[in-house]
Curated annotation (Swiss-Prot):
Species name: Streptomyces lividans
SUPFAM superfamilies associated with the record: Voltage-gated potassium channels (SSF81324)
Written domain comment of the UniProt record: The cytoplasmic C-terminus is involved in the gating mechanism.
Protein name stated in the entry: pH-gated potassium channel KcsA
Disruption of the gene: reported phenotype: Cells grow slower and to lower myceliar densities.
Keyword annotations of the record: Cell membrane, Ion channel, Ion transport, Ligand-gated ion channel, Membrane, Transmembrane, Transmembrane helix, Transport
Reported function: Acts as a pH-gated potassium ion channel; changing the cytosolic pH from 7 to 4 opens the channel, although it is not clear if this is the physiological stimulus for channel opening. Monovalent cation preference is K(+) > Rb(+) > NH4(+) >> Na(+) > Li(+).
InterPro entries: K_chnl_dom, VG_K_chnl
Entry GO CC: voltage-gated potassium channel complex
GO BP, sorted A to Z: action potential
Annotated transmembrane regions: 28-50, 88-111
Ranges facing Extracellular side: 51-61, 81-87
Length: 160
């Protein structure tokens, strides 16, 4: 991408998001992470309640249920632990959605941070290049004006 175009895009993104656009992403990612931890803890507890006493249930202790909720939220799903009751499966759906959403927000915040850093770097390069080009243009213009002034003086001197 040409530097001028990337600089324009960087300015456009900064204009749209403002200075606090990146902070907004980090706050959303932080809130999603806190919510995920709450869902993991509550989901583990609810899974134990839902699964306790069911035939073939494996999620009958809190530590096992907590491990299962982390597996489920991260979409690893080893398959070693799984709910067997309807209520346990509904809890699993909530844990899955919370995990997928939270990891998506954190990933988006990280990507925004990396892209923002690169855009800022390119924007600085573009501003520096534009300033250097403007200074060169000004010097060239002044030199041309001086030459034209000299030529006009020479023509005036020759006419006299």
């Amino acid at each position: 991408m040409p530097p001028m175009l990337s600089g324009l895009l960087a300015r456009l993104v900064k204009l749209l998001l403002g200075r606090h656009g990146s902070a907004l992403h980090w706050r959303a990612a932080g809130a999603a992470t806190v919510l995920l931890v709450i869902v993991l803890l509550a989901g583990s507890y609810l899974a134990v309640l839902a699964e306790r006493g069911a035939p073939g249930a494996q999620l009958i202790t809190y530590p096992r249920a907590l491990w299962w909720s982390v597996e489920t939220a991260t979409t690893v799903g080893y398959g070693d632990l799984y709910p067997v009751t309807l209520w346990g499966r509904l809890v699993a759906v909530v844990v899955m959605v919370a995990g997928i959403t939270s990891f998506g927000l954190v990933t988006a915040a990280l990507a925004t941070w990396f892209v923002g850093r690169e855009q800022e770097r390119r924007g600085h390069f573009v501003r520096h290049s534009e300033k250097a080009a403007e200074e060169a243009y000004t010097r060239t213009t002044r030199a041309l004006h001086e030459r034209f002034d000299r030529l006009e003086r020479m023509l005036d001197d020759n006419r006299r």
